[in-house]
Amino acid sequence: MAENIVKKYPWLSITTTLEKYIEPDYYDKILKNYIFNGKHDLDFLKEAAESVADAANIVEFGPGTGRATSVVIAAIKDIKSLTLVELSDRMLEKCKERFSSKKFIEYINSDTIDFILSNNKQFDFAFSLWSFSHSVHQSLKSLGLEAGKIKVREAITKLLTNSLKPGGSFFLIHFDSLSQEQSISIKQRRKDNFVFQENTQQSPSKLLIDEILAKLKNNRDIDFGCQHFIGEPIKFNSMDEALEYYLNFHMESHFNESKNIQVILEELTNDIKKFQSLDGSIKITPGCFIYNIARKN
């Protein structure tokens, strides 16, 4: 990477792998608040958790630094077991530190889809905020679209018809790939991930999840609801802040050592400028889909 680019953008020196992800403290520092209809994403989770307040056995997919985990622990008082499934060993270690007094937590260092396929436990409640799609897309990328879809269909079907106890539920927040926020990111992700080639429809993860849910509902295995939200604009004080957020959060620093980083920076800057005010501040609107899925008794 050209030295002058790193000098201009010091945060480009941050590099990670899929398994490592960015440092937990840095993640918490740059993470923005996501607000939909006046409620934070965690507020929706809190409502879902309170509706299953008697859940004893719980699993979370992709806890990150544990911000959603804390909400569920507070909402459900008599948890017997809570399984945290996290691919990033850094994030998992952060959770171990954060919840060291919670002896009912089991920590699993694994990809979500792989865990579901190998798991034999049953759960009353499962939840995942934003990260579930990462595992789906990784399966599609590593195995190819057709083989990956077979694996993902098997995993999600198993989760909803076997891993969940009868009457159990799954709460999922999935990004809206056609939102202003995600459209900018996915345009760049197409450069290294063939699963994002279509730009006029939702992500392969969203389409695949919807396909599976429709089939299981038709078979009377589950019931589910899905709400689409357009959120309050994500605010950045400067172009530098916005670029850092996109490259190190949305794009997980995977492009920071790319030989094409200068082109990527220029393209991102041009796309983000469309949302920049005269005072230099930037407002970009996010979107999401919130699923509440229940296995039938």
Summary of predicted features, one role per range:
Residues 1-53:
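Conserved class I S-adenosyl-L-methionine
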Residues 55, 122-123:
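Local beta-strand N-terminus motif with an aromatic residue
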Residues 59-115:
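Class I SAM-dependent methyltransferase SAM/SAH-binding core
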Residues 124-151:
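A short SAM/SAH-binding and catalytic strip from SAM-dependent methyltransferases
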Residues 144-166:
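A short glycine-rich, Lys/Arg-flanked "PGG" loop and its adjoining helix->strand segment in the class I
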Residues 158-162, 167-232:
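Conserved catalytic/acceptor-binding region of the Class I
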Residues 228-278:
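C-terminal helical/coil "lid" or tail adjacent to the Rossmann-like core of SAM-dependent
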Residues 286-297:
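Core SAM-dependent methyltransferase catalytic element
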